UniProtKB/Swiss-Prot annotation:
NCBIfam families noted in UniProt: argC
Domain of life, source organism: Bacteria
Enzyme class, first EC level, given as a word: oxidoreductase
Active site: C148
SUPFAM superfamilies (alphabetical): Glyceraldehyde-3-phosphate dehydrogenase-like, C-terminal domain, NAD(P)-binding Rossmann-fold domains
Keyword Kinase assigned: no
UniProt keyword list: Amino-acid biosynthesis, Arginine biosynthesis, Cytoplasm, NADP, Oxidoreductase
Organism per entry: Caldicellulosiruptor bescii (strain ATCC BAA-1888 / DSM 6725 / KCTC 15123 / Z-1320) (Anaerocellum thermophilum)
Record protein name field: N-acetyl-gamma-glutamyl-phosphate reductase
Cited function: Catalyzes the NADPH-dependent reduction of N-acetyl-5-glutamyl phosphate to yield N-acetyl-L-glutamate 5-semialdehyde.
Annotated pathway: Amino-acid biosynthesis; L-arginine biosynthesis; N(2)-acetyl-L-ornithine from L-glutamate: step 3/4
Length: 343
């Protein structure tokens, strides 16, 4: 059995990690760490765990993670790297769900976040986008779990970038997310009366995930590229739907795209290519799947891609567990086979 600790276990992502790991046949949770819920049991703070688990939250101390083989760190950027360093120093595999270990370019990270305190650890880390970076994940002690928006966008674009089928500076990503992506901390802007029956764009031209998407897309394309990314907030709890536009550099039709995407993702269980219809949020809600569909606008020779994920699962906790499965040589699907919550 793999022994797991979760730091930052009382937030939305932390609780989702607990829920998913409890159903994993090869994992035992040995500690759940949260200063805000210290000494409370999970079935008291989250009654959905009644008769399932009575794990007790505790404050962080090295002893709390000493028994673990893997440490999941679900803390905000900046704070997280301190705990990742501690876990690394005592020989633990650390899967970090903040932005702190997603970048290879320190300047990109510093521009959108802050100066990294442990830049030497970036060379020890792998970007945890499972379908793209599997071999690096297998060999890394620190795995930087991708952001939710980047997961949806990069996987939607990867086959076209790898095959150099689009104009590298024509990419526009228009993503819509459920409110859980903002986290558990209260903010009036995310309150019911502000969101219900509303729909809005935010952080236009300056969302932090833009640089993460650009860095990874540039790697796939083999050259630096610039793109436009605009996030929107939907009045739903969970899910991301990205509509991605790019100019094709040669004449190809939808049948060609079906062949290209199916070939690129032929061995990827969690990627579902929609050939005859377009994905919807309800198909992926509660799952680790990425649903991808597309059309070609023949008038403009532009491709339009639809990419859907559950932001808390494939965009966070589920992908972190998929990374753990890869790292510990388990079946990648273990603990993650789920049918979407249709209603």
């Amino acid at each position: 059995m793999i022994k797991a600790s979760i730091i930052g276990a009382s937030g939305y992502v932390g609780v989702e990690l607990i829920r998913l790991l409890l159903r994993h046949p090869e994992v035992e949770i040995v500690s759940i760490i949260s200063s805000s819920s210290n000494q409370l049991s999970i079935d008291k703070t989250n009654p959905q765990f009644k008769k399932v688990s009575n794990l007790v939250f505790e404050e962080f101390k090295i002893e709390a993670i000493q028994e673990a083989d893997v440490v999941f760190c679900a803390l905000p950027h900046g704070i997280s790297q301190e705990y990742v360093k501690i876990g690394y120093d005592i020989g633990k595999v650390v899967i970090d769900l903040s932005a702190d270990f997603r970048y290879k370019d320190l300047q990109r990270y510093a521009k959108d976040y802050s100066q990294h305190k442990y830049p030497e650890l970036l060379s020890k880390s792998a970007y945890g986008l499972c379908e793209i970076n599997r071999e690096e994940i297998k060999n890394a002690q620190i795995i930087g779990n991708p952001g939710c928006y980047p997961t949806s966008a990069i996987l939607g674009l990867a086959p076209l970038l790898k095959n150099k089928l689009v104009d590298k500076n024509s990419i526009i990503i228009d993503s819509k997310s459920g409110v859980s992506g903002a986290g558990k901390k209260f903010d009036f802007a995310y309150s019911f009366c502000e969101l219900d029956e509303n729909f809005k764009a935010y952080s236009v031209t300056k969302h932090r995930h833009t640089s993460e998407i650009e860095e990874k897309c540039s790697f796939l394309f083999g050259e630096d590229l610039n793109l436009s990314f605009t996030p929107h907030l939907l009045p739903v709890k969970r899910g991301i739907l990205s509509t991605i536009y790019a100019n094709l550099i040669k004449k190809i039709d939808k049948n060609d795209l079906v062949e290209i995407y199916n070939e690129f993702y032929k061995d990827e269980y969690f990627i579902r290519i929609f050939e005859d219809e377009l994905p919807e949020l309800k198909y992926v809600r509660g799952t680790n799947f990425v649903d991808i569909g597309f059309e070609v606008d023949k008038k403009t020779n532009r491709v339009i891609i639809i990419s859907c994920i559950d932001n808390l699962i494939k965009g966070a906790a589920g992908q972190a567990i998929q990374n753990m499965n890869i790292k510990f040589s388990l079946d990648e699907k273990m603990g993650l086979i789920m049918v979407g919550e249709y209603f």
